[in-house]
C-alpha cells in the first residue's frame, strides 16, 4: 500500500517549483514544464523516487539506525522537530553549526556542557548563584538547547541525513558527503542535486508540501519502531519463559 498518492502530492502543491529565472539546470530531468514562469516538477518521477527513499529509510530504521532530520528554515523547523521526536530520532531545526558532523569530537564536548547545565538548572545549583551568573548560565543553556538539543542523545554520528531544502542545507550535505553518510533530500528546481544520494524532486517551501513528506516518513518509521518494540517484547517474554 502506498504511503502517499499522486493526488495528495498535487493537493499539497509538491509539483510547484521556483520561478524559471532561479532554476538549476541540473534539475532539468525532473521538470515537467513551465506555467506562468514557474517550473512544474514532474510528479511521475517524484512519486516513485519518494517511495524508494521511504523504503531505504525503512531499512535503516529496521536496523535501529540513527536518522538525522535537518530543516532549519521556517517552513520546516517545527515539523522536523515533531517528526524526529515521534520517530525517536534526531534533528537540527535551527542554524546548522559548521562542523556539526565533521568536528564531532568538539560537538560532543558542547553536548556534555548542555547536559551539565540541564542538571544544574534542576538540582538547585542555579538558585545558589548570583542573579547575574544564573542569568548567564540560563542563556547559555537556552543557546545550547536550540543548537544541540535535537542531537544531545544521538550518541555518535548519524547513519543518514534527511534534509528539507538541499540548497539551504548545503553545508550539512557537504559534511555528510565528506564522511560518507548517505543523504536523502527534498530538492527543488533552484537546487543542486549533487551530493544527494536519494533525490526527491519537490516543492521545499510550502508548508503543506513539507508536512506531507514528513507525515509520510513518520508513518513509515513509526510502524518500524512499533514492530521493533513488539519484537523486543517477544524476545524478552521468550527469554523469561526459558529461564522459568
Swiss-Prot record:
What GO molecular function terms would the record report? Answer: structural constituent of ribosome
Q: Record's Gene3D superfamilies?
A: Glucose-6-phosphate isomerase like protein, domain 1, Helix hairpin bin
The record ties this protein, via InterPro entries, to:
Ribosomal_uS2, Ribosomal_uS2_bac/mit/plastid, Ribosomal_uS2_CS, Ribosomal_uS2_flav_dom_sf
PROSITE patterns reported in the protein's UniProt record: RIBOSOMAL_S2_1, RIBOSOMAL_S2_2
Give the UniProt record's GO annotations in the biological process aspect: translation
Highest taxon of the source?
Bacteria
Q: Which SUPFAM superfamilies match?
A: Ribosomal protein S2
What cellular component GO annotations does this protein have? cytosolic small ribosomal subunit
UniProt KW keywords: Ribonucleoprotein, Ribosomal protein
Recorded family membership: Belongs to the universal ribosomal protein uS2 family.
Q: Which PANTHER family match?
A: 30S RIBOSOMAL PROTEIN S2 PROKARYOTIC AND ORGANELLAR (PTHR12534), SMALL RIBOSOMAL SUBUNIT PROTEIN US2M (PTHR12534:SF0)
Q: What is this protein called?
A: Small ribosomal subunit protein uS2
